[in-house]
Amino acid sequence: MGLEISTIAAIVSAVISSVSLAISLTAKQPSMDQQDYGVGINRRGQDNPILIPFGDCLVPCAQVYNNVNNYNTNYLAQLFCIGLGEVKSINQIYINAVPYFNNTLPQTIGWHTYKTSANFPNVSLGLKKGLPTESAMFNQIIQNSDGEVSANFRADGIASLSLLVERWVSTGGDNEIRFINPKNKVEALVSGIAVIDPRTDPNCLGRDDKSKRVWGSSYTNPACCILTYLLDPYFGMGLQVEDVDITSFILLANYADNKQLKFNGFVNQDSTFGEILKDFADSFDGDIYLESGLVKVRPIDVTASLVHLNETNRKTMQTLSLLST
């Protein structure tokens, strides 16, 4: 069964529509005109759409909570949303472009206490990959939140970062203490989410069953990343499997492996469908296109498929022609 005209229009021109929830964020419902208003932070924050990390990428972290302990103002607690989970690993945290960890490797999930970092000896932090059901909020944050944060702040399904800063005046040199101001640029280097690989899951059961999604070498493969985004009903376009030419994705996945092409980047849900798909296509220097009502992919050095016009797909081709002019 092919795509409906309304779905085709969404693929090529609509603004992205998906809702997300992160820690203390409240989701705003998307409207029928396919606009996404992101998520609203309940307290001391701003609107930030959740980011979807694919492959190995550096992700800007959105601060969702900030508090100075009322009884000991040396302590500053902050919570950050990294992006949609579950991510494969969190490899490094950067504070104002300075690395927190002494190596850039998959870091231990959990709490990292003071003196862990040579660059930030006064900063403790907690890492979560965004499991479907996460562990309770770190006690160190709860104890310095003046009763505002509870154990229920788990951040289910959200990769997150918790910071606890003990601020003191440096006596050992200018570089001893780098983190005092509560406003800092925080970024996370992550290996992103699991993907649908049509070579091992030709029926794309991973669309609705995330346990069928894989990492391995697939999580950086452009074909697998694109297919996951097209099919995922939560953060992606939510297409049905029958709307996609799976064979073309299998061919592209093998082509990308052979050419060592990778997709390493995050999807920003403030972007339009068209902008997101263009970025995906740029990663393998190819095309994402519609043919006979199906979404297909191809690298540009592969001979283009012929399009046979008939009454069934005439309107589809007219829509694409108008958008390409």
Language-model features: locations:
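Acidic, small/polar-enriched beta strand-loop surface segments
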Residues: 85-89, 309-325
